[in-house]
Design a protein with these regions (language model features):
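A nucleotide- and high-energy phosphate-metabolite-utilizing enzyme signature
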Residues: 1-474
Length: 474
């Protein structure tokens, strides 16, 4: 089938010529892979679904390292192989001599995204181009992670920088388009407050965008001033809908991100957009403990000039209010027990939800931020930084070790998301993928990694229990 044009990728004479020259080196590379039979089978499946082969075969002929990486992806990272099927040209970025140096640099990433989006001729093309560059850059960041070129922490920062840049550019485009019909609300300022992994710069390739839209109107305007004016609350609700659609709507180029807006006041039952004063009132009078926990790492990810500082000041004021230690800790312990019952881990490596996993580390850090914010002195900091600081000031003596464990858990979860479309289905867990996990976590073997992770989970559980007992008396 390969040599007789049985696949679309090999129908062109030029493709078959390249493949003939490539084949000896390709077979040798596959033979060296962890599971040669599986790697060959996956490469054949990959080839059968590839729409065109000329460009890719030419690249693989002339770049040994690229050929080795692609075979490695076949064996250990089927999600990455799938991306190559849909956009074979993403491999071009891997042969750039500057790739290893540039893949972890935010300024380079932002520059590439901005330059690509600047060529959009209209609004819809901008929406499509955001998806194209987003998927390409996600692939390159994931490749940097899985090849060991960058750490899990760096990958999280780059996935987040990509998401923020795309969200910022799309928000500008959405507002320009929206204002053509509805004008602006005089005296209004708008900002996006990010939560979760986006806020802490720990996004993975599969992360949602977790944010809410907050606005403020000075001067008392009640309506927008466009051809089709809208009441202020309706204006910002519609604007939010347009932004969410720009990010989540499927186009011919796919979906950019899923959006999670459950942390807006009153959750999914509340308005899509909220005024700053209403946000503060809700947080101070009606919010649950879990909402305050989430607020401890919230971060403004986009805002009109001067408005970010207002939102940040409001968040600081909310979190500076005294919290009853007993009630806070009781609520945290109850929430964790309910989560264990309603959202049990789906796999032994579901390191977010397993007892002693990421959730427990986050609950320790976030509850400490509620009860000892000034003493910690790291407002809105990511979990690992808070944990390390808790060790420094003696509130959680094991803090430095917990921060280290957080790094290991994050590395495993980043790699799982980058390599596997469904990390919790066993068929993706090939020997090659297991070996990759061990390599990325500096473990001698996968068996040793699994054993060490179990020990780490026990350490986290014990440290969390001691913290909760101590925190009751703060």
């Amino acid at each position: 089938k390969w040599h007789y044009g049985g696949y679309a990728a090999t129908r062109a004479a030029a493709a078959r010529a390249h493949l003939t020259e490539l084949l000896p080196a390709l077979l040798l590379t596959i033979a060296k892979a962890g599971n040669a039979d599986l790697s060959f089978s996956r490469f054949d499946n990959f080839l059968s679904r590839l729409p065109s082969g000329v460009q890719l075969f030419a690249l693989l002929r002339t770049h040994d390292d690229l050929r080795e990486l692609l075979v490695q992806l076949m064996a250990s990272a089927p999600r990455m192989a799938e991306a190559v099927i849909h956009r074979a040209h993403v491999m071009d970025g891997l042969i750039d001599p500057a790739f290893a140096d540039e893949v972890s640099r935010r300024t380079v990433l932002v520059g590439k995204v901005d330059a690509f989006l600047a060529d959009a001729r209209d609004y819809q093309e901008g929406i499509d181009r955001a998806r194209i560059i987003g998927q390409e850059q996600q692939f390159l960041i994931a490749a940097g992670l899985l090849s060991g070129t960058m750490s899990a922490r760096q990958a999280g920062e780059q996935f987040t920088a990509l998401a923020e840049t795309l969200l910022h550019r799309l928000f500008i485009a959405v507002r320009v388009e929206f204002e053509k019909r509805h004008g602006v609300v005089p005296g209004a300022s708008v900002g996006l407050l990010g939560f979760g992994k986006m806020a802490s710069r720990e996004m993975t390739v599969a992360s949602d965008l977790d944010f809410i839209l907050i606005y403020e109107v000075e001067g008392g305007a009640e309506d927008s001033n466009g051809e089709k004016p809208l009441a202020t609350s309706q204006y910002f609700a519609r604007l939010t809908q347009r932004l969410v659609a720009a990010v989540t709507a499927p186009t011919s180029e796919g979906v950019l991100y899923q959006a999670d807006m459950r942390l807006r006041p009153s959750g999914n039952a509340g308005p899509l957009a909220t005024s700053l004063s209403a946000f503060q009132r809700y947080q101070e009078e009606s919010a649950w403990t879990w909402e305050h926990l989430a607020l401890t790492r919230a971060r403004v990810v986009d805002a009109d000039e001067g408005f970010a500082a207002k939102i940040e000041g409001t968040v600081a004021a909310i979190l500076s209010r005294p919290s009853a230690a007993g009630k806070t800790i009781d609520d945290v312990v109850s929430m964790r027990a309910l989560m264990a019952k309603e959202r049990p881990p789906r796999h032994p490596f579901d390191l977010k939800l397993v007892p002693g996993g990421l959730i427990d580390l986050e609950f320790v850090a976030q509850s400490a931020q509620l009860l000892a914010r000034e003493q910690i002195g790291r407002p809105q900091a990511p979990t690992a930084i808070v944990l390390a600081r808790l060790g420094e000031i003696g509130l959680v003596p094991e803090g430095a070790r917990l921060a280290e464990i957080h790094g290991v858990f994050s590395t495993v979860l980043q790699a799982m998301s980058a390599a596997l479309a469904d990390p919790f289905k066993d068929e993706g867990w090939t020997d090659a993928f297991r070996d990759l996990l061990a390599q990325l976590t500096n473990e001698p073997s996968f068996t040793r990694l699994a054993e060490d992770l179990k020990e780490m989970q026990g350490e986290v559980q014990s440290a969390a229990e001691r913290w909760y007992a101590r925190a009751q008396e703060l």
